[in-house]
Amino acid sequence: MTKVIMNGCNGKMGQTITEICKADADIKIVAGIDLYDGIDNDYPVFSSIDKCDVDADVVIDFSNAKAVDGVLDYCVDKQVPVVLCTTGLSDEQLAKVEECYKKVAVLKSANMSLGINTLMALLKKAAQVFAPAGFDMEIVEKHHNLKLDAPSGTALALADSINDAMDNEYHYVYDRSQRREKRDPKEIGISAVRGGSIVGEHEVLFCGQDEVIEFKHTAYSKAVFAKGAVEAAKFLKGKGAGHYDMADVIAAK
């Protein structure tokens, strides 16, 4: 069984992970970290991770950027692997994460969904077939009207997976409104839609002469990210120092 400290346990994602772990005999949350203590959990909750005195195999972090430094310090000091799901880190924090790779196991991915990460692997293979055959590649991502960034980090990660497979020969185009020229064969177009309560939808098109191949992933709730984090925690238990991602989790299955 994998014993977990859930940092950000009383947030939406923390509570979703709590419920998933209750139904899984192979993993258990043994302690939580959260400033807000208004939820009755079946594990002890501490206001900060440095106050936690419970032994664990892995830390799952779904909190906020301000808390990440303390989490990293704790995990390095205690030699506890960490699944780092918090986004919006500063350049200084990202540099600190890079340093932590040398000292403890850290799993960090642009998207925790098993589906998205499987899609990335499929796109690498598809690009190697379709790109040399002259197919154009476009990505369309859709999210709710409260999302601040565009394009999404996941859309960029999908584009990167294609580009990596093609020796980084492609550049990204986000806006064609100011251009009056033919499409560059070496571009990947990325378009963003914002509306309603769309959790997350990503579509990748390979457009050739007389045929179009589409890959699509739709997230109907944020539970897909929570499930991925749980699988990542199981995978990370006992791992040595280094940078891991969801591709490693999928490869191990």
Which residues make up each language-model segment?
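N-terminal Rossmann-like NAD(P) cofactor-binding module of classical short-chain dehydrogenase/reductase
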Residues: 59-60
